[in-house]
Structures are given as C-alpha cells and as structure tokens.
Swiss-Prot record:
Monomer. One of its GO terms (molecular function) is transferase activity, transferring alkyl or aryl (other than methyl) groups. InterPro entries: Rhodanese-like_dom (IPR001763), Rhodanese-like_dom_sf (IPR036873), SelU (IPR017582). It comes from the Bacteria. Residues 16-138 form the Rhodanese domain. It comes from Psychromonas ingrahamii (strain DSM 17664 / CCUG 51855 / 37). GO terms for biological process: tRNA wobble uridine modification. Its EC number is 2.9.1.3. It holds the Pfam family Rhodanese. Involved in the post-transcriptional modification of the uridine at the wobble position (U34) of tRNA(Lys), tRNA(Glu) and tRNA(Gln). Catalyzes the conversion of 2-thiouridine (S2U-RNA) to 2-selenouridine (Se2U-RNA). Acts in a two-step process involving geranylation of 2-thiouridine (S2U) to S-geranyl-2-thiouridine (geS2U) and subsequent selenation of the latter derivative to 2-selenouridine (Se2U) in the tRNA chain. Keywords: Selenium, Transferase. This is tRNA 2-selenouridine synthase.
C-alpha cells in the first residue's frame, strides 16, 4: 500500500471513530440508497437537477454539463450555502463529500469559502469511504469470532449487548430475526446497515481483538448479513445459552407483548398503536403457519386472539404465555435443536445466560 493510500485509510478510520459530522452532497435519491452514520444530506443538486445534468453530460460532454449545473442551481444556491454554513457552524469538525470527492465537492467547498467558511473535503468521496468500510467487514471475517447460540428466548441479543466486543447484527438491522422480529420503525437500507456494522467493528477493534456475534441465519428480516462476515460466522466456534423454559417464556412475553405494546402506543397513540400491535402478533403467527400445520395454527390463533382480548380488557399479558409456549414446543425449539446438532463440533461451552456471559468475558478479548 502506498503512503498516500495508507494516510487516506487512517483518515477514514479517524472520521468514523471520532463520529465526525459529514455533509453528504449527493442528491436525495443517492442518499436514500444508503448512507453513513453521522451524515446529513444537504445536496448540491436536487434529484431532477442531477438527472438533467447527467443527461447533458452524456449528450454534450463535461463542459456543457457543468454550465447547465450552474444554471440550474443558481436560483437556490444561496439557500443551499446557508444550510451548509449553518451545519458547519453547529458542527465545527464537519467534513463534506460528494460521490467521488470531485467536482460537486470542490464547487461546494469553494462556495462556502467565498462566504468565509472553510471546510475539508473527504478525498475519494462517498465511494472511497464505502469501499473502506466494505474492507473493514471483510477483514473482520478473518478475526477471532465467537458465536452465541441457544433456543429462542435465551437472551442472546441481550448478552451480545452486554459485552464490550459484542456485534449486534440484529439490533443494527432493527429486526429480531424471527417471524416476530419486526419492529415499530422500518429497517435501514442494506448499504446503511453494512456501513453501521463496519463502524461498530471499528469501535470494537479499539479495545478487543475478537467479535462475539449471535447465531443468525443470513437473512435478518429483509436485510442480509454481509457475505464474507456470514461465511466467517459459519466456521467460528460457539457457546450455547441453555436457560430454563420458564425464564425464556417470561423474556419472550416481555419482548413480544409488554415492550411492543409500549413501542406501538408511543409511536402511534393508544388506538392506532393497539391495532398495529395486534397486527404485529397476528402476522408473526401467520408467518409460521406452514411450519405449524393448519390445525395447530388454528388452535394457536384462537389462543392468541383470546390473549389479546384479555390484555385489552385487563392490561394483563399472562394469556400470551400459552401460545408462546406452544410455538416454542412445536416450532422454534425443534427447529433450533436440529440446526444445533449440525454445529455440535463447534460448541466450546454451554450454560445459563450468566454462566455464558462470564465465560465469554474471560475467554474472548
């Protein structure tokens, strides 16, 4: 690696580790496809302006496209400069970038300079930062990885979150990974998800040489664990949490029912929140109907509806324990035990939540 490349790599690492505020000059349509943590979309051009300039570039070349770009943004450029300057004033350490760190970045920085505001340009722009974070994830797949397994409700995600070297792939995906994994808010875009995981890995690497990750399928809701990282996970040693059924039931009842009721009510208000919560549980159960079989699904659905009615009338979530116990017994536990048997040679330790946490604290650094 050349000295200049190494310096840029160190710069990118520093920008992310210091949580440097970033002005993303790309058009909104570009930003929506994926962005970085700490970035704010303050575009030089609107989507329509960008499209016109792109068409002009293809037909008439760069010079004509630049001229058209100046003409298109002229009427609103003072407003855009004001927004950039305000962001820089509120975030003195801010940098800016466009897609490649080229013309859009230089023009915007010059506009700011003409108004007495200096700002640094990220060399290589979004494309270089994105490539850097992809490399971070790829390199992480070669690190020492430890996978945390266990039946549904064992608190694997809670365990990951409690560890200094835990990489929370479900939390960053905003999905718990199961049929009941959907959250109140939407999942991020795949690119944004990968970017955030990479930044998390950078932070962990400051104090640890290993990563502890939850045993997960490749898909987490509508998102996917990055390919190289997932490949590393399938080879890594494991620990397995074996919490008693009663503890698991109470934990799942809290997560599926108590917590989700609160989240939906907070986001949507009491009436709409309740309707969304009902739909969340109904859709979750419907999502595993084929695995349960028609008859079991009908029985469990009846139990679920009774539990919802009881909760609405009394506020008690106790009735939900019945159908949750059934899906553990008839679906989740048999499925996970089957999967775990195929990974038995990778298991290094088994124990309760607390025992596994203590083992990981001592044996993974």
């Amino acid at each position: 690696m050349q000295q200049s490349d190494l310096q840029e790599q160190q710069l990118y690492r520093s920008l992310f580790l210091l949580k440097t505020p970033l002005i993303d000059l790309r058009a909104p349509v570009e930003f929506a496809q994926g962005a970085f943590p700490e970035s704010c979309n303050l575009p030089l051009m609107t989507d329509n302006e960008r499209e016109q300039v792109g068409t002009c570039y293809k037909k008439e070349g760069q010079a004509a496209a630049i001229t058209l770009g100046h003409q298109l943004v002229a009427s609103d450029i003072q407003n855009r400069i004001r927004k950039w300057a305000q962001f820089k004033e509120e975030n003195p350490t801010a940098w800016l970038y466009c897609f490649r760190g080229g013309l859009r970045s230089r023009l915007s920085a010059q506009f700011l300079k003409d108004h007495g505001v200096d700002i640094n340009i990220v060399p290589g722009g979004y494309k270089a930062l994105r490539r850097y974070l992809i490399n971070v994830i790829d390199q992480a797949s070669e690190k020492k990885l430890m996978i945390v397994g266990g039946n549904t409700g064992c608190g694997k995600t809670l365990l990951i979150q409690a560890l200094d070297n835990g990489l929370d792939i479900e939390g960053r995906a905003n999905h718990r990974g199961s049929s009941f994994g959907k959250q109140v808010t939407e999942q991020p875009r795949q690119i944004s998800y990968e970017n955030q995981l990479a930044v998390d890995i950078l932070h962990i690497s400051q104090h640890a040489s290993s990563l502890v990750i939850e045993d997960e399928s490749k898909a987490v809701g509508a998102l996917y664990v990055p390919e190289r990282l997932f490949a590393g996970m399938t080879r890594a040693p494991m620990v397995v949490v074996n919490d008693p059924l009663e503890i698991r039931l109470q934990r799942l009842c809290y997560e599926y029912c108590t917590l989700m009721t609160e989240k939906f009510n907070l986001a949507l208000g009491a009436e709409q929140g309740w309707q969304a919560y009902e739909k969340y549980l109904q859709n979750g159960l419907y999502g595993i109907r084929k695995r349960l079989g028609t008859e079991k699904f009908k029985v469990m659905n009846t139990v679920l509806e009774a539990a919802l009615k009881q909760q609405k009338n009394t506020g008690s979530v106790e009735g939900h324990l019945n159908w949750i116990a059934s899906i553990l017994r008839d679906y989740y536990d048999p499925m996970y035990q089957y999967q775990l048997e195929k990974k038995a040679d990778r298991v290094q330790f088994r124990g309760t939540f607390q025992e596994v946490k203590e083992w990981l604290t001592v044996n993974t650094k």
